[in-house]
From Swiss-Prot:
<feature type="topological domain" description="Lumenal">
    <location>
        <begin position="47"/>
        <end position="65"/>
    </location>
</feature>
<dbReference type="GO" id="GO:0070072">
    <property type="term" value="P:vacuolar proton-transporting V-type ATPase complex assembly"/>
</dbReference>
<comment type="subunit">
    <text>Associates with the V0 complex of the vacuolar ATPase (V-ATPase). Interacts with ATP6AP2.</text>
</comment>
<feature type="topological domain" description="Cytoplasmic">
    <location>
        <begin position="1"/>
        <end position="25"/>
    </location>
</feature>
<comment type="function">
    <text>Required for the assembly of the V0 complex of the vacuolar ATPase (V-ATPase) in the endoplasmic reticulum.</text>
</comment>
<dbReference type="Pfam" id="PF09446">
    <property type="entry name" value="VMA21"/>
</dbReference>
<dbReference type="GO" id="GO:0033116">
    <property type="term" value="C:endoplasmic reticulum-Golgi intermediate compartment membrane"/>
</dbReference>
<dbReference type="GO" id="GO:0005789">
    <property type="term" value="C:endoplasmic reticulum membrane"/>
</dbReference>
<keyword id="KW-0472">Membrane</keyword>
<keyword id="KW-0812">Transmembrane</keyword>
<dbReference type="GO" id="GO:0012507">
    <property type="term" value="C:ER to Golgi transport vesicle membrane"/>
</dbReference>
<feature type="transmembrane region" description="Helical">
    <location>
        <begin position="26"/>
        <end position="46"/>
    </location>
</feature>
<feature type="topological domain" description="Cytoplasmic">
    <location>
        <begin position="87"/>
        <end position="101"/>
    </location>
</feature>
<keyword id="KW-0968">Cytoplasmic vesicle</keyword>
<keyword id="KW-1133">Transmembrane helix</keyword>
<feature type="transmembrane region" description="Helical">
    <location>
        <begin position="66"/>
        <end position="86"/>
    </location>
</feature>
<dbReference type="InterPro" id="IPR019013">
    <property type="entry name" value="Vma21"/>
</dbReference>
Length: 101
C-alpha cells in the first residue's frame, strides 16, 4: 500500500523545475509588454502632438489630435507584433528544449 501512495505522490509532483522558471520568464515578458503597451502609445501621442505636429509642422490643435492618435494606434500594433514575435520564439525554444530530453 505504501508503494502505491509513493507512486501517487510522485505523479502529482512536477518532474523538473523548468516549469517554474518558464512560468517566471513568461510572467516577466507579459509584465514588460504590458508596461510597454501602456507607456509607449501614451508617450508617443503627447510627444508627437506637442513637438512634432504642432511644433515642427505647425498644424492646428484639431489636426494634431488626429495625427497623434494615428501614431499611437500604430505604436500599439508595433508593441503587439513584438509581443507575438517574442512569445512565439520563447515557446518554440522551450518546446525544442523539452523535445531534446
Amino acid at each position: 500500500m505504501e508503494r502505491l501512495d509513493k507512486a501517487a505522490l510522485n505523479a502529482l509532483q512536477p518532474s523538473d523545475f523548468r516549469n517554474e522558471s518558464s512560468l517566471a520568464s513568461t510572467l516577466k515578458t507579459l509584465l514588460f509588454f504590458t508596461a510597454l503597451m501602456i507607456t509607449v502609445p501614451i508617450g508617443l501621442y503627447f510627444t508627437t502632438k506637442s513637438y512634432v505636429f504642432e511644433g515642427a509642422f505647425g498644424m492646428s490643435n484639431r489636426d494634431s489630435y488626429f495625427y497623434a492618435a494615428i501614431v499611437a494606434v500604430v505604436a500599439v500594433h508595433v508593441v503587439l507584433a513584438l509581443f507575438v514575435y517574442v512569445a512565439w520564439n520563447e515557446g518554440s525554444r522551450q518546446w525544442r528544449e523539452g523535445k531534446q530530453d
